């Protein structure tokens, strides 16, 4: 295996393990939500402590995921959570930890993985983070900092399900780049944590 492939597999493993730690307390929550309801395109603004990121969520391709994200956003849950995992040239991840690195439960059931919707993990897309269980995503998400095709759906099995893309950045990639470029270290049992806390101040869904 060449160095590039080894790095990709390592980064994918880091993502899965980090989310496993933050979502491990959700096993006793309700069963997976299977109902689909197409909701069209939704505009969302993530206001962070370093700037705003505007996104368009594709409710036609990922209706379950978009509804879940919008419902959580409208509840105010994301306020005060952080981008806790940042890897330059890979992705920035947030939506599940507090500033003190403690887990924050959204109280929502895990959702069906919609990674087989034809959307790819390209630079600037937003996707759901999860555990090794393909259908375990709740609130944590990541924004791809580059094209990460190895995260795409390749088959309906544990190894091939991939990570469900449900939208893309329409404005604010400079903020994503700035977050990806921050210095990181270890904190609270996690790696690749920004040394200066990057807070999600709000996630606003357009009317």
Where are these regions (language model features)?
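Residue-level detector of alpha-helix boundary/anchor positions
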Residues: 15-17, 159
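Sec-dependent N-terminal signal peptides
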Residues: 9-15
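Cyclophilin-like peptidyl-prolyl cis-trans isomerases
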Residues: 4-8, 23-207
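C-terminal motif of bacterial Sec signal peptides marking the signal peptidase cleavage site
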Residues: 18-22
């Amino acid at each position: 295996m060449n160095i590039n492939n080894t790095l990709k597999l390592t980064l994918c493993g880091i993502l899965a393990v980090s989310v496993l730690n933050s979502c491990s307390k959700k096993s006793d929550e309700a069963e997976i939500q299977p109902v689909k309801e197409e909701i069209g395109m939704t505009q969302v603004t993530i206001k962070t402590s370093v700037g705003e990121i505007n996104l368009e969520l594709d409710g036609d391709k990922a209706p379950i995921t978009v509804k879940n994200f919008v419902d959580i956003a409208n509840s105010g849950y994301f306020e005060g959570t952080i981008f806790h995992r940042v890897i330059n040239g890979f992705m920035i991840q947030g939506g599940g930890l507090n500033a003190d690195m403690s887990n924050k439960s959204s109280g929502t059931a895990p959702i069906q993985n919609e990674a087989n919707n034809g959307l790819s993990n390209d630079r600037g897309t937003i996707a759901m983070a999860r555990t090794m269980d393909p259908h375990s995503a709740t609130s944590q998400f990541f924004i791809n900092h580059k094209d990460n095709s190895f995260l795409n759906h390749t088959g309906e099995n544990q190894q091939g399900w991939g990570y469900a893309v449900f939208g893309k950045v329409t404005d604010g990639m400079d903020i994503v780049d700035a977050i990806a470029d921050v210095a990181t270290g270890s904190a609270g049992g996690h790696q690749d944590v920004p040394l200066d806390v990057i807070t999600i101040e709000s996630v606003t869904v357009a009317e």
